[in-house]
Structure formats: C-alpha cells, structure tokens
Regions:
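NAD(P)-dependent short-chain dehydrogenase/reductase
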Residues: 140-191, 198
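N-terminal Rossmann/SDR dinucleotide-binding element
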Residues: 1-56
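Catalytic helix-loop patch of NAD(P)-dependent Rossmann-fold dehydrogenases
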Residues: 78, 83-86, 106-107, 111-152, ...
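SDR active-site strand-loop-helix element
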Residues: 16, 57-61, 98-104, 108, ...
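NAD(P)H-binding glycine-rich loop region in Rossmannoid oxidoreductase-like domains
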Residues: 39-79, 92
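C-terminal amphipathic/interface module of NAD(P)-dependent oxidoreductases
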Residues: 256-283
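Mid/C-terminal beta-alpha module of Rossmann-like enzyme folds, strongest
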Residues: 202, 209-254, 259-260
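Glycine-rich Rossmann NAD(P)(H)-binding loop
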Residues: 159, 185-190, 215-222, 271
Length: 283
C-alpha cells in the first residue's frame, strides 16, 4: 500500500507505526516519510495530526491474533476500539477521510448454512470471538463519529511479506513444502482470500471515491484453507502429499473461528470498479 500510493504523483504519504520502518527504501523517493508513533499514545497521535493535517488516514493497525485477543481483552480493546475511536475524532476534527480496515471475523460464519450465500455489507455482525467483537466495536465508533469514512473489511491477505512482517498462508505453505515439512490445514473453514496488490487497489479506490460506508475488499472466490494450500502446491510443483487436511475439531484451536466467512464484493465491484484476481492468477 505504501509503495503503490507513493508511486502516484498526487499523494504525499506518511507511514507511522509502533515498529521501525518496514520499507526504508521508500524514504529516497521524497514522496514518503516514516514517523514512529504508538497508536495507544493519545498525545503523540494528536501531535502527529497537528504536524501533518492529513487529507486521508488509512488505519491498518490492529491486534489481530484471535488467540492472543481472547486472553488479553484489555489490550485488544485499547488497540482495536479505544485507539480507533480517537483516530475517528481526530479525522472529524481535521476533516480527514478515514479508511479503517476491519475483518471477516465480525461474522459468526453460519450464513452459508442458512442461505448458501456470501456475507454482504448489510448483514449484521455476530462475532464468535473477542477479536471479532473488538473489530466490530471499532467499526461502530468510526461510523458513529466520522462524516467522511470507509470501512474496508479484508480477509486472508496474502502476498510477499516485507522484512519484519509476519507471513501469510500462501508463504507458510510454500516454505513448509519447500523444506519437505508436513503441514496441517483446516478443510472445513471457508474464506475469500485477498491478494495484497488487490487490497491496495481497493484502498486507492476508496480514497478517490468518497462514498461512506462498509465495503468488502477481498477476493471473489471462496476457498477452504486446504484448497488454498493445494493450489499453492500444484502451481509451485511442490509435494501436495505433505498437506494434511483436518477438521476444525481436529485442529483443536483454542479460540472459536467462523466456519464460513466468505464475503461478497458486489458492492465494491459496482460502486468502486473493484475487480480482484483469483489465487491462480496471482500465483
């Protein structure tokens, strides 16, 4: 996202994070600068807004590990709700468009069992874990406070991770299979995986189109985690017999997750012209 936005002449981009700059090479472009700021530090965030006076704020920060959030409620709420609320108030004060990233985990995963459909933006959230609950509450803060905003729900984002970033399912499968290691993947959880390049394109479209509301910015094909793994193995000509599909019960995850959280992109396709690629195309 930083790289793509910095490549456009009309944007001057400031990246800020609790951690050190993950893309220092962009510093040489003169279209990008990095400032180290903790989103939980209210005074520092206020000073940052005062110094930059941003036209657009894109919030990619979150405490996004469901198992960790389940046992660290206070920290999860502080980052995913309280800090988001502060950003929303500052965006309102500075008349900045606020683009806030959220997640498919705001849903309970039962819609397909009832209707056979994908989740649309109009369906009310019903999270099954604390991470999803905090992201839902963060969405509500943005919608209640801001007059110029977009909430971008994303899902299973994959692509080449930069140094310091945690990996993703595609890289995990590739690395394990290349090393000749077995990998267990869930065969009864469905997702709409999102290529990071398509996500970046969707965010840019949300900058240029000032429609308010929630948009699903994800892929347009619904796959199980096991199907994702097999597609990666087949394309890379790696040993697919090292992939062991298991059920959710067999995986014994400590935190509940939605079984089916495939999201519809028809709203984003119609209003934004968003047209993501399929996993096989990206590979």
């Amino acid at each position: 996202l930083l790289k793509d936005l910095s490549a456009h002449k009309q944007y001057n981009v400031t990246g800020w994070s609790l951690h050190s700059d993950i893309f220092p090479a962009l510093e040489n472009t003169k279209k990008y600068r990095f400032i180290e700021v903790d989103i939980r530090n209210e005074a520092s965030v206020k000073e940052l807004f005062k110094a930059i006076c941003p036209d657009v704020v894109i919030n990619c920060s979150a405490l996004s590990v469901p198992d960790y959030c389940e046992t660290h409620h206070e920290e999860a709420y502080l980052i995913n709700v309280t800090a988001v609320e502060q950003l929303a108030h500052l965006c309102k004060e500075y008349q900045s468009r606020f683009i806030h990233l959220s997640t498919d985990f705001v849903f309970d995963g039962k819609i397909n069992e009832r209707t056979g459909q994908l989740y649309t933006e109009e369906i009310l959230p019903a999270p099954v874990n604390y991470y999803g609950f905090t992201k839902w509450k963060g969405e509500e803060k943005v919608a209640d406070i801001c007059s110029n905003y977009a909430i971008a729900r994303v899902e299973i984002v994959y692509g080449k991770a930069l140094p310091g970033q945690h990996g993703n399912i595609v890289q995990l499968v590739m690395n394990r299979l290349k090393a000749g290691q077995e990998i267990r993947v869930v065969s009864d959880q469905w997702r709409t995986p999102t290529f990071v390049g398509d996500l970046s394109d969707g965010i840019r479209r949300l900058i240029e189109n000032t429609t308010n509301g929630i948009f699903h910015i994800c892929g347009d094909e619904c796959l199980t985690i096991a199907e994702i793994a097999y597609q990666v193995a087949d394309y890379m000509k790696l040993n697919r017999t090292l992939i062991y599909p298991v059920t959710t019960e067999e995986m014994q995850e400590s935190t509940p997750r939605p079984r089916f959280s495939g999201m519809s992109i028809e709203k984003a396709r119609t209003i934004l012209g968003y047209n993501p690629r399929k996993l096989k195309e990206v590979l």
